Amino acid sequence: RTEQMTADLSFKKYDLLSIIRQALRKYSRLFILQKIKLNLEEMDYSVITDEKWLLFALEQILSNALKYTKEGSISIYMSKEKTETLVIEDTGIGISPEDLPRVAEKGFTGYNGRDHKKSTGLGLYLSKEILGKLNHKLELESEVGVGTKVLINLGRLQN
């Protein structure tokens, strides 16, 4: 699927917050049902991207955050330390240090995916592949029992 998408890419200038809100709308019911608090930082950035594919990647990342966060919150904000970097941070179960380097590999589910029997091992893989084709970069930071931060360097942000 990611091989075919290159011909489908349409780069334009989009409002980042608008794309984030679209992704959140898809999961609004789950936030309510699971009683997960959403902390969405107001932001005024435009990003050069393909809206459809960035939206797809954000939806995959939010799906994972909701899947592995039983209580607490999901926060979406711009990094203070890393320029042009969007952060999606959850208070979920976290990813073990031995699984962290491999979670974006195709088909890799790690301990959490096997333990929760909900993982295909494709969500983060597809997100990383798609973001790469969009000239964005995905990084992960995680601590077991504390949560996970997904950092997306969007590059070429304008405000």
Where are these regions (language model features)?
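Conserved micro-motifs of the catalytic ATP-binding
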Residues: Q4-L9, E42, S46-T49
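Short helix-loop "hinge" at the ATP-lid/N-box region of the Bergerat-fold HATPase_c
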Residues: A65-L66
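Short conserved segment of the HATPase_c
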Residues: I95-F108
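Short beta-strand/loop element within the Bergerat-fold HATPase_c
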Residues: S73-T83
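Acidic ATP/Mg2+-coordinating residue in the GHKL
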Residues: D90
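A conserved beta-strand-to-alpha-helix junction within the catalytic ATP-binding
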Residues: S10-S28
